[in-house]
Regions:
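Beta-strand-rich N-terminal accessory domains
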Residues: 2-114
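Acidic/polar, glycine-enriched structural segments that form the non-catalytic walls/loops
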Residues: 3-37, 148, 153, 159-172, ...
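Aromatic-rich carbohydrate-recognition surfaces in CAZymes
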Residues: 94-98, 181, 340-365, 426-585, ...
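Extracellular-facing/secreted segment signature in eukaryotic proteins
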Residues: 103, 108-110, 115-126, 140-146, ...
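The feature captures the catalytic groove of carbohydrate-active enzymes
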Residues: 166-168, 173-176, 233, 263, ...
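A generic secondary-structure signal for well-formed alpha-helical elements
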Residues: 181-187, 195-203, 315, 319-325, ...
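Large, well-folded core regions of big proteins
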Residues: 379-398, 410-414, 562-566, 573, ...
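Active-site core of glycosidic bond-cleaving carbohydrate-active enzymes
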Residues: 432-463, 541-543, 562, 566, ...
Length: 851
């Protein structure tokens, strides 16, 4: 097989996206690693550091910065692969004229755990010195380059995620090894690719008292059934088990000039022994499994290389895990199964398909990556700034971790209808929270039919009602609180029970989510969030209105709007009932948490919810016009006008103690008491950002928007980025959550700065987020929020960076930068602030098409 074409073309090389040398890998992923801040009732997961995900939505393998397996994502369960034996059994090794080197810079002793087998050097071949390693992250692809005395090896991981068809959902991956003889001698080379079996892992819940979906995984020690296979020019090993239908394949195409041998079983702690080679590159002996041992399989590939010659070898990995299994015992067949009608040959057929298709995956992926980079560099702000354009490109591509990691179910019925669900994160295992998904266009971009189904679920929730009482907040989380409630009813007399025990679902409210993993299977369509009573939140309905309009404009699906219009109008009527003070802005119950920032207590009208409400009304007005509903439009316009007049009461034009000019909407104001909170809230223009991005005219005048952005930029800056809130004098606020830097908020902020002509400031925000993601080891696990300054946590010796929770979908908002540029171009060309649906519909298909 000839070497594949390099990624270099017309000023674009994937190595420019993000490449770091070996010593910097250690600095970033070990010494600079972000810790976890204890905020709330429990400390979240120190998430496995990841540079690539091999597989597909609902089933993927995490790859560590050292090229080793470190986690399995299986139908919403994050299964930690902490065993040293499992990790190092995934490391390829190369033998050049009899001398073998493991293709990782990680030393086996570095991975020791207290309960793991001690690492002795004769278990493994020597590693590559870190100075001879480089790492390129170009999500969803990865390259690791190794320089050895006589050869150079590039290990490239190629994903089907952007393949553009059914293969996107097939849990496949190909590792392409490019081996180059850099010497002046003819070399005899054997490449050995081992893999641990991930079939029938023994899983134990990591934190049984918490709400997460995280498990410790241990390799199976019984029931292994591994078989060699040879089919239609492909050769490999299928790893199975007597205890499950799951199977895993490791395979290579048969190639001229390459001798192939397979080792069906090797004990994970006996790499050098069980994978000992003969002089011809074949395995010295084949063994059978014994009880209480864990196993993997391996392939050896032996070839001769002339001086300066190279050879490219693809190795396919297939995870044939046909069933998605859940905590309540429910099972659903994965969609890919329908593409392989012969059950008995399915695993081998999957590996064969990967071997045949990977070059198309690669060319399509590089074409899309280049298109993203080119579209950024073509804008006035980035013309001539290649480094800045690459920075933004890698931030955008990084958010493709979400569909590879957080998809928890994907099914297709007999009529071809697809349903899928996505996790908020593995620590807060809620399914498609509507307030979180609102920020990201990734689902609409990649899977518009799934996005439509999800949106329909939230529209349907408006009419749903369940008066059954349930516990909320501490009483939902702690059995001690529930016990106290039952045994001491007298202590609750005269208290509001809204956040203690109240109805499960009130009619007219929008569901927060579509379920939670610890409660049952993900297709139940029941909102399980109970940290606060979101029946009375005031941001969920406006966000749904904007989301519906966005989807209709980007897909042209007017039937969706027609079918749901009456329900949407009922939802608005229900929301307006939460306007208790009659100022036109629904404020919810006093002293209650009332929006996505669920540890932030507000009073009266607040800048975030007021602008969200106006954005929702603006979306409803536009939809009424699209449906020619004159009466509905007039009614909604009246609500908008009253809300706008009340928003003006939050406007402040003054100076702080430093004499700096401040122009912004204050955090909140109570028209009844006159109480005001003058903190500066970064998120006060989120709804404006959303409406601009879907081609609607900004409802806030441009001069005012610029003034707000300048105030936020100057006031809310911190070491890590722009904090959610600061006082008018730039000091930290009281709320722990308010102190935090939100990556999504910073992406929204950067895009608004760019849109309103402040490109320099926008780039500065992106630089801060680039440091968060790539300098602190958060590639492929983007944190949602993090501490604003370096802090010293309990047990730490020096101040350092900390996040609250990682691997979140909301930062997918960074993709909207591309949409905002498109909208701005269309506005200039058409000399109109409004962009029609027909001009938006082609955007994502054109962005994601092949070369």
């Amino acid at each position: 097989m000839s070497a594949s074409k390099t990624s270099k073309s017309t000023g674009f090389d994937i190595r420019d996206i993000y490449t770091i040398p070996g010593d910097k890998i250690a600095a970033i992923y070990e010494r600079n690693k972000m810790g976890v801040h204890f905020q709330g009732m429990s400390k979240t997961l120190q998430f496995p550091q990841t540079v690539a995900l091999q597989g597909a939505p609902t089933c993927s393998i995490g790859i560590s910065p050292y090229g080793l397996y470190n986690r399995l994502n299986d139908a919403g369960r994050l299964i930690m692969l902490n065993q040293k034996a499992v990790q190092f059994a995934s490391a390829p090794f190369i033998c050049v004229d009899g001398a073998c080197t493991m293709l990782t810079q990680k030393q086996p002793g570095d991975a020791e755990l207290p309960d793991d087998i001690p690492a002795v050097k004769n278990y493994y071949h020597p590693s590559v010195p870190e100075k001879n390693v480089s790492l390129t992250i170009a999500t969803p692809s990865l390259e690791i380059a190794f320089k050895l005395p006589a050869v150079k090896v590039v290990r490239r991981l190629i994903s089907p995620l952007l393949s553009g068809g059914d293969q996107t959902l097939m849990p496949l991956g190909v590792e392409e090894f490019q081996v180059e003889n850099t010497s002046n001698e003819v070399l005899e080379i054997t490449l050995v690719v081992p893999r641990p079996s991930l079939v029938n892992l023994q899983e134990k819940e990591l934190k049984p008292t918490d709400q997460d979906s995280v498990y410790i995984g241990v390799a199976a020690v019984h029931g292994q059934k591994h078989e060699e296979f040879r089919s239609a020019g492909v050769r490999g090993v299928i790893m199975g088990s007597a205890d499950t239908s799951n199977r895993m394949a490791l395979a290579v195409p048969e190639m001229a000039g390459v001798a192939v041998d397979t080792q069906p079983y090797f004990c994970l702690n006996r790499v050098t022994g069980d994978l000992l080679l003969n002089a011809d590159g074949s395995f010295y002996e084949k063994r059978q499994p014994t009880l209480r041992s864990d196993y993997g399989a391996a392939i050896s590939l032996t070839f001769t290389l002339k001086p300066k010659a190279s050879k490219t070898i693809p190795v396919a990995v297939a995870l044939d895990f046909p069933q998605q299994v859940y905590i309540d015992g429910a099972t659903f067949e994965r969609k890919y199964v329908k593409s392989f009608p012969k059950k008995e040959t399915r695993t081998a057929d999957m590996a064969k398909l990967a071997s045949e298709s990977y070059s198309k995956w690669w060319s399509r992926t590089v074409a899309i990556q280049k298109r993203i980079f080119d579209s950024i560099q073509a804008t006035p702000s980035y013309k001539g700034d290649k480094a800045g354009a690459m920075r933004l490109t890698r931030l955008i591509l990084n958010e493709l971790h979400f569909p590879l990691s957080n998809v928890i179910v994907w099914v297709e019925d007999d009529k071809g209808n697809e349903r899928a669900r996505f996790l908020e994160c593995f620590d807060y295992a809620y399914i498609d929270p509507s307030d979180v998904d609102w920020y990201s266009m990734v689902l609409l971009m990649l899977f518009p039919r799934v996005e439509k189904d999800l949106c329909q679920g939230f529209v349907d929730s408006i009419q749903a009602v369940d008066p059954t009482p349930r516990y909320y907040h501490f009483h939902a989380s702690a059995v001690e609180a529930r016990k106290h409630f039952k045994e001491h009813p007298e202590e609750y007399e005269g208290k509001s029970l809204t956040q203690i025990r109240d109805a499960f679902k009130t009619k007219g409210s929008v569901a927060h989510d579509l379920g939670a993993m610890p409660k049952g299977h993900p297709l139940r369509n029941v909102s399980d969030y109970a940290w606060y009573n979101n029946n009375y939140w005031v941001d969920l309905f406006p966000k749904l209105m904007m989301r519906v309009l966005r989807n209709v404009k980007f897909t042209g699906d007017m039937d969706f709007l027609k079918k749901n219009w009456e329900t949407l109008k009922f939802g608005l009527d229900s929301l307006l009932k939460l306007d208790f003070d009659g100022d036109g802005i629904p404020e919810g119950y006093p002293e209650d948490v009332k929006n996505t920032f669920d540890n932030l207590v507000l009073f009266g009208a607040d800048a975030y919810d007021a602008t969200q409400f106006l954005g929702g009304c603006q979306a409803m007005i536009k939809m009424a016009q699209m449906l020619k509903d004159k009466d509905g439009e007039a009614k909604i316009q009246k609500a908008f006008d009253q809300g706008w007049n009340s928003l003006e009461k939050l406007w402040r034009d003054g100076k702080n103690k430093k004499g700096e000019k401040l122009q912004y909407y204050i955090t909140c104001y109570d028209p009844k008491t006159g109480n005001a909170n003058t903190d500066v809230w970064t998120n006060q223009l989120d709804a404006l950002w959303y409406m601009i991005a879907i081609g609607e005219e900004p409802c806030i005048p441009a001069d005012r928007a610029r003034a707000i952005l300048k105030t936020v930029y100057r006031t809310n800056h911190s070491f890590m980025g722009w904090a959610m809130c600061k006082t008018e004098n730039g000091a930290p606020v009281e709320s722990d959550q308010g102190k935090d830097v939100y990556t999504t908020s910073n992406y929204v902020f950067a895009q608004l700065l760019e849109y309103y002509g402040m490109a320099k400031e926008s780039k500065e925000v992106y630089k801060h987020m680039d440091r968060v993601v790539f300098d602190y080891g958060n590639s492929m696990i983007t944190p949602d929020n993090l501490r604003a300054e370096l802090e010293k946590e309990s047990g730490e010796s020096v101040p350092g960076p900390h996040y609250i929770v990682a691997a979140y979908p909301r930062p997918g908002a960074v993709w909207t930068h591309l949409v905002m540029n498109h909208v701005k171009d269309l506005q200039a060309k058409k000399k109109s602030k409004t962009v029609d649906s027909k001009d938006l519909i082609p955007f994502f298909p054109n962005l994601l098409k092949g070369a």
